Amino acid sequence: MAKKKDEEYCSFCGMPRTQVNLMLEGVHAHICDECALRAGEVVREALQKFKSEETNNLKREDLPRPIEIKEFLDSYVIGQDDAKRFLSVAVYNHYKRLLQQEDSDGVEIEKSNIIMVGPTGTGKTLLARTIAKMLHVPFAVVDATVLTEAGYVGEDIESILTRLLQAADYDVKQAERGIVFIDEIDKIARKSDNPSITRDVSGEGVQQGLLKLLEGSIVNVPPQGGRKHPEQKMIPVDTRHILFVCAGAFDGIEKKIAQRLNTRVVGYTAGLQNRHIDRENMLRYIRPQDLKSFGLIPEIIGRLPILTHLEPLDRDALRNIMTEPKNAITKQYEKLFAMDGIKVSFTSDMLDFVVDKAIEFKLGARGLRSIVETIMMDAMFTMPSGKKKTLVVDKAYAEAHLNIDDLLQDQ
């Protein structure tokens, strides 16, 4: 037996079994551990190249059309038809820009970055995450509140592209065709319309830093994120074909809109000329100059040419969110309990109770999940270890298990 082992050699590098850590035996061949590791790296690189080529070889006829994109969004997000239409068209045109051939006519289709304005809990982030499910390009979500100017505590602007590179498995060509969603863009508005003598490191300074990304330029990106340092190897990324979608709540911007329209937001008598204005939903009248009044610099606004808004969710919309989408809250909890062999059901009056509380405390759609989580916590803790295999969650159960103080502390 020892003699046979001495005669076994790696079919790739020729090393004998006695000089390697591990020898894997096939039908008519052997491979040592070192060659197996190298082969694994080759396979990974080949698969990544294939994935990149598959993306680069997108065909016009294979592209999802705007109506198809919106239908997909409809299956996950309730309402917000206007925002869905804008987003669907922008994503479709982004694909077409990627497929654009060099023409002799010199016409180059410019990208149309988007900014979405809407109250907290109306679905801005959910729209972005949902559309990522059907994309064939890398997609990254970034929180603008963590960004600061270079040299200050926080994340550099370039860290946005680090996230995109990570989503693309560090395939630069793929990342350069990706989509970036910047959430809470309103939090980097400058603190006032007038320049301040104090440094606004997380406001106007960050906006200035974002300009080079939005307008399209080659940016040196630290591969692992964090602060740049002289010895770190940078990855150059061309942002000309990266689509940026920005979103924010812009709390208080309704007053800016009302001032421009010379009307009041709500609660007062308006002049005859303003009777046609819907003062309970002023966001539908938002214009770029309102963003400037709020604190976005004109250069940023100019590079976000598509402006759309999200409607406040009414009671019916919140009620539908509980049950209608593919990943509705109730469906998620039914699945969670089913994994423990427990059948859970929610009564209509319980769902109405949850919606009423979300409206009462102005929690929006995001608050629905928090309320249900609080109500279901005791059952999720005890039932997996118990013998009871059914649970009917009605209004009485919800009232008994909802701790409002804990809920509001979490918001």
Swiss-Prot record:
Cross-referenced SUPFAM superfamilies: Glucocorticoid receptor-like (DNA-binding domain), P-loop containing nucleoside triphosphate hydrolases
Keyword list, A-Z: ATP-binding, Chaperone, Metal-binding, Nucleotide-binding, Zinc
Annotated Gene Ontology cellular component terms: HslUV protease complex
PROSITE patterns: CLPX_ZB
InterPro entries from the UniProt entry: AAA+_ATPase (IPR003593), ATP-dep_Clp_protease_ClpX (IPR050052), ATPase_AAA_core (IPR003959), Clp_ATPase_C (IPR019489), Clp_protease_ATP-bd_su_ClpX (IPR004487), ClpX_bact (IPR046425), P-loop_NTPase (IPR027417), Znf_CppX_C4 (IPR010603)
Ranges where the ClpX-type ZB domain occurs: 1-51
Gene Ontology BP terms: cell division; proteolysis involved in protein catabolic process
Annotated binding of ATP, by residue: P119, T120, G121, T122, G123, K124, T125, L126
Any GO MF annotation of the entry: protein dimerization activity
Keyword rRNA-binding in record: no
PANTHER family assigned: ATP-DEPENDENT CLP PROTEASE ATP-BINDING SUBUNIT CLPX-LIKE, MITOCHONDRIAL, ATP-DEPENDENT CLP PROTEASE ATP-BINDING SUBUNIT CLPX-LIKE, MITOCHONDRIAL-RELATED
Annotated family: Belongs to the ClpX chaperone family.
Subunit structure of this chain's protein: Component of the ClpX-ClpP complex. Forms a hexameric ring that, in the presence of ATP, binds to fourteen ClpP subunits assembled into a disk-like structure with a central cavity, resembling the structure of eukaryotic proteasomes.
Summary of the function given for this chain in its UniProt record: ATP-dependent specificity component of the Clp protease. It directs the protease to specific substrates. Can perform chaperone functions in the absence of ClpP.
Protein name as it appears in the record: ATP-dependent Clp protease ATP-binding subunit ClpX
Native organism: Porphyromonas gingivalis (strain ATCC BAA-308 / W83)
